[in-house]
């Protein structure tokens, strides 16, 4: 995958009542932790995986996030929630 993006019809939101991040899809709602939501916000079809990792590394100085980002994007791809924009 070169430039991940959310599948058409999916959108991220924060539910203030439940105090949780959610990925809204036509089939329902996927609950997300804050880290997953932050990664998926960067999956806009414009950024490469390296760009996403770089943006997060800049926010969290010294953290090695590459494996975690790749694992999340892969899991979301397998579920059909993230696709390649390329």
For the regions a language model picked out, list residue spans one by one.
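Long, charge-rich, low-complexity alpha-helical segments
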Residues: 28-86
């Amino acid at each position: 995958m070169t430039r991940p993006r959310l599948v058409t019809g999916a959108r991220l939101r924060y539910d203030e009542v439940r105090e949780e991040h959610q990925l809204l899809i036509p089939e329902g709602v996927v609950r997300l932790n804050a880290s997953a939501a932050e990664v998926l916000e960067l999956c806009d079809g414009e950024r490469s995986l390296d760009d996403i990792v770089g943006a997060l590394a800049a926010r969290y100085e010294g953290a090695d996030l590459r494996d975690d980002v790749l694992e999340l994007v892969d899991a979301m791809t397998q579920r059909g929630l993230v696709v390649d924009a390329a």
